[in-house]
């Protein structure tokens, strides 16, 4: 199952979203998930958008019904703090939002879908995908 990061949700709010991202969103049969952190980030972006911007309303009408929003709890907070402390000791400090998003994906065994693979490439055991890039071509194995 997939956990969609803020940049994917933001792309899906656009009037003309990236065709590859939209196609994956529309064709996915597994439940699509996001963190309450990501939902807050895109809602905040919509709130500070210029007057008359209707992207949030479009998102709520067209995209939100297809998403399950995962809440935070104490165990995710503990895991996020552990991850952030580990990353800081390795010289890769990240903000609390990224820590909570990574913890949510890791704890749930989810694939984090993000454009910012580099932000999460150091998280041990975390699987990521970038729907903005074409899928990697299958490599034939010799017989």
PLM regions and their residue ranges:
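Alpha-helix capping/helix-boundary segments
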Residues: 8-9, 38, 76, 100-101, ...
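Residues at the C-termini of beta-strands that transition into short coil/loop
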Residues: 36, 73, 116, 132-135
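Active-site neighborhoods of divalent-metal-dependent phosphate/nucleic-acid chemistry enzymes
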Residues: 68-115, 140-143
């Amino acid at each position: 199952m997939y956990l969609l990061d803020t940049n994917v949700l933001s792309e899906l709010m656009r009037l003309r979203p990236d065709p590859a991202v939209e196609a994956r969103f529309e064709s996915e049969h597994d439940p699509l998930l996001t963190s309450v952190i990501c939902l807050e980030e895109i809602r905040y972006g919509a709130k500070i958008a210029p007057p008359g911007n209707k992207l949030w309303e479009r998102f709520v009408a067209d995209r939100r019904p297809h998403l399950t929003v995962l809440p935070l709890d104490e165990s995710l907070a503990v895991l996020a703090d552990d991850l952030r402390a580990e990353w800081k000791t390795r010289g890769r400090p990240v903000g609390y939002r990224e820590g909570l998003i990574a913890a949510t994906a890791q704890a749930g065994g989810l694939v984090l879908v993000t454009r910012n693979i580099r932000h999460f490439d150091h998280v041990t055991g975390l699987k990521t995908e970038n729907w903005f890039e074409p899928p990697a071509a299958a490599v034939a194995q010799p017989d």
